[in-house]
Amino acid sequence: MTSSSSNRPFSHRSPNTFLTYPQCPEQPEIISQRIWDLCSHWTPLYIICAREAHRDGNQCLHALIQTEKPVRTTDSRFFDIDGFHPNIQSAISPNKVRDYITKEPLALFERGTFIPRKKSFLGNSSKGNSDKKPSKDEIMRDIISHATSKQEYLSMVQKSLPYDWSTKLQYFEYSANKLFPDIQEEFINPHPTSEPDLLCNESIKDWLQPNIYQVSPQAYLLLQPNCYSIDDAISDLEWLDDLTSKQIMEQGSAASTSSVQQGQENLHGPEA
């Protein structure tokens, strides 16, 4: 799992973590100590770090750290050291990763005792000690130890325990969700912050006129017998609108729809 190439939320969970620091000038011993300290919560057991030279002249650092408990982090910058950001992967085969790191190192540092990957029970019953069939507990322990994602976990269960997978899939899905919980994306406010403008008179007025004040001049003529023309009705309604707006501004609080409508019924125009 890389740390930056995907738009999906970052998540890393593995007892065998393979790190590559491009163009990092630090010594392998210093980087190893920093990584060891970063993983102290998961009880580090072994680390190896080596400097490798590329054909283009650039150098990088490779590191493999093994922990007693799987390293869990959703922070893609967790392993950053002095501004150097590594590529982060789960070492499915720590044996092969270690062989790669020790291939042609310019400098190498090692601490602890390397833990070879245990022989997997998945699909290997025909080789070696085939007389002893592993129990389901042993198979599941192996799957939990090596799976690095929800999809890989379910795929390994399906491959090694097909009958249980087909009859108890909902239980395996539940355990997969617990082992590899979905990462909640950080909330991004769709409304960018701006200078406070709580009144917004122009915008509110544009919405207020067609949505709240729905008294038509024709309806006003029916309610007010002293009003004799459409022009008089429009004039009265405009006066009511201005008066109500001034009262709201003076009181410093918004009037409710019901009180506005009641004011429209009781107040008389300037010609009444």
Swiss-Prot record:
A motif (RCR-2) lies at residues 60-65. A divalent metal cation binds at residues 52, 62, 104. It holds the Pfam family Gemini_AL1. Gene3D superfamilies: 3.40.1310.20. GO terms for molecular function: DNA binding; endodeoxyribonuclease activity, producing 5'-phosphomonoesters; metal ion binding; nucleotide binding; nucleotidyltransferase activity; structural molecule activity. A motif (LXCXE motif, interaction with host RBR1) lies at residues 198-202. GO terms for cellular component: host cell cytoplasm; host cell nucleus. A motif (RCR-1) lies at residues 18-21. Residues 221-230 are annotated as: Transactivation. Residues 251-272 are annotated as: Disordered. Keywords: Activator, Covalent protein-DNA linkage, DNA replication, DNA-binding, Endonuclease, G1/S host cell cycle checkpoint dysregulation by virus, Host cytoplasm, Host nucleus, Host-virus interaction, Hydrolase, Metal-binding, Modulation of host cell cycle by virus, Nuclease, Nucleotide-binding, Nucleotidyltransferase, Repressor, Transferase. Residues 11-114 form the CRESS-DNA virus Rep endonuclease domain. It is an enzyme of class 3 (hydrolase). Its EC number is 3.1.21.-. It is found in: Host nucleus; Host cytoplasm. InterPro entries: CRESS_DNA_REP (IPR049912), Gemini_AL1_MSV (IPR001146), Gemini_AL1_REP (IPR001191), Gemini_AL1_REP_central (IPR022692). One of its GO terms (biological process) is symbiont-mediated perturbation of host cell cycle G1/S transition checkpoint. Homooligomer. Interacts (via LXCXE domain) with host retinoblastoma-related protein 1 (RBR1), and may thereby deregulate the host cell cycle. Part of the C- and V-complexes which are RepA-Rep-DNA complexes involved in the c-sense and v-sense transcription. There are 3 rolling circle replication (RCR) motifs. RCR-2 may be involved in metal coordination. RCR-3 is required for phosphodiester bond cleavage for initiation of RCR. The LXCXE motif specifically binds to host RBR1. Belongs to the geminiviridae Rep protein family. This is Replication-associated protein A.
